[in-house]
Amino acid sequence: MVDLRRTVVVRWLAAGDAGNFDAFDELLHPDVVVHAPLGLSTASVDHEKAVWRDALAAMPDLRHDVQEVVVDGEIEMARVVVTGTMAASFAGVEGSGRSFRIDQAVITHLRNG
């Protein structure tokens, strides 16, 4: 059984939700590549921090609730429920004040750690 508290994907999402971007330096490679929809892909830890800052500014209650993690060698796959409220515009989505719930899959490939 996987100890969710120890997986990189869980720690990364929790740090992002909390606005603890200093933790990204420990968890992510400086040249991390994150593939994301809506033009939110990043190619460095600094860019990833910037996207999270913008996301939290638009959705202050943004949360990633990890439902399940499967680990296979250097791969961590997570099933995540993302919730929040669009208080301001972000990634082309207007700030409507409406809350949302999205099911998400996150797949990470770990290197050097």
Where are the regions a protein language model picked out?
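C-terminal and inter-domain tail/linker signature
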Residues: 1-112
